[in-house]
C-alpha cells in the first residue's frame, strides 16, 4: 500500500494540518511536511477543506444475499463511499437471515469480495445454540425485531443474548398492538390508499410499549441495549429515565429527524417506513439530536415496483446513505448543529457503542478513515447520479448547503468527484 500525505487539511477546530498516512494508518498529524515525505509520498492537496472522521453507519440493510433486486453489497457500499461513509454494519434480515453461523460466514464472504468500505455484521437471534455459535464470528451485535415476536419469545431471546456480552440492537414496536391496529384499519377500504393511515396503525404507543418492555428485560438480564430509530419525544423521555441505571444507547435516523407525516401527502407510499413518520404531537426534530447517541441511516432500499403498491402491501423503507451527510451539513450551516456534534453522532459514538477498534477519530495510530467536506457546496438532493439501486427519496429536490467531496478508507481514496473506487475492504472485528 502506497503512503499518502493529505496536505492543507482544516480540522473542525479550524487548524490547518497535514496528515501522514502509512500502510492505511495515520502515522502523524503535522503542521509541516518533511522534505523526505515530499519526495517519497503521494501528496493530496485538500485545499483547506474540512476533514472529519470517516462516517460509520451501524444500521444498513444491503439485502444481499437473497434480495439483490433491491440492493447488493456492491451497489450499497458504493452508495456508502459516495455518501462519505467508510464503515457500515449490515442488519441480519436477508435471505437467509444471518442467524446461524453458516449464514453469517456466507454473508461475510460475499461482503469481503464486493464491499467498497469496511464492514461489520449484526447477527439475528434464533436458538440459544445458534447465538452461541455465532459468537466465534465476532458479530457487532445481535438484532431483534420486537414486532415479530411474542413476549415469551422475547424473554427467551433477551436471555440468550445476555450470555454473550454483546450489545442487543432493537427495533421497538409492540406486535400485539400493531397487529390489532392494522387488522382494524384494513376493514375500511378507504384506508387502502391513505399512507398516513399506516402511521396510525404503527402508532407512537406501539413504540412506547415495546421500549418499556425492552427496558424491563434489560433490567432482568443486565444487557447493553442499542435502541434503533427512536421516533417520538415521549419514548425519548422514557429512555432517558432508564439510562440513569442501564447501559442504553439511542439511534436517530435522518428521515425521522427531517420529515413528519405530512410527507405522505406529497410522497405517498414511497415515504413508508418502519417505524413510520410521526405527526407534530410526537415527532423528533433536529432540536432533539442532543438527546441521541448516534445517527444511523436505516438505509432500506426497495424496487420502485415494491414501493408503488397500496398502503398495506407497499414495502417499508427509505434509502439514506447518499443523502444523510448533505442533510446534516445543511443544519451545521444553519447553526442548528455543530460539526463536533455531527462527528460524535456519526463517527465517534458509533465506534464506541459497537466497540469498533481504531475507528471514529482522526488520531495517530487509528485507521486513516477520513471524509473531506466542502461546507459551501450547494445543490438540490436528487436520486440521479446515485449508486444505490433504490431510485427514490422523499428528500428529492431539497436544497442542501455542504457536501462530502472525498472519502478515504484506510488511506485509499474510495470516492471523489462523484466517482467511486474499490480497494480491499476488511471485516472490522
Swiss-Prot record:
In-chain residues carrying the UniProt-annotated modification N6-carboxylysine: 143
GO cellular component, one term: cytoplasm
Record pathway: Pyrimidine metabolism; UMP biosynthesis via de novo pathway; (S)-dihydroorotate from bicarbonate: step 3/3
GO molecular function terms attached to this record: allantoinase activity; dihydroorotase activity; zinc ion binding
Annotated positions binding Zn(2+) 2: 143, 171, 229
Keywords: Hydrolase, Metal-binding, Pyrimidine biosynthesis, Zinc
UniProt EC number: 3.5.2.3
One of the GO biological process terms: purine nucleobase catabolic process
Domain of life: Archaea
Binding positions for Zn(2+) 1 per the UniProt entry: 59, 61, 143, 298
One Pfam family matching this protein: Amidohydro_1
Family statement drawn from the similarity comment of this UniProt entry: Belongs to the metallo-dependent hydrolases superfamily. DHOase family. Class I DHOase subfamily.
Task of the protein: Catalyzes the reversible cyclization of carbamoyl aspartate to dihydroorotate.
UniProt-recorded name of the protein: Dihydroorotase
Source organism per UniProt: Methanosphaera stadtmanae (strain ATCC 43021 / DSM 3091 / JCM 11832 / MCB-3)
Lineage per the UniProt record: Archaea, Methanobacteriati, Methanobacteriota, Methanomada group, Methanobacteria
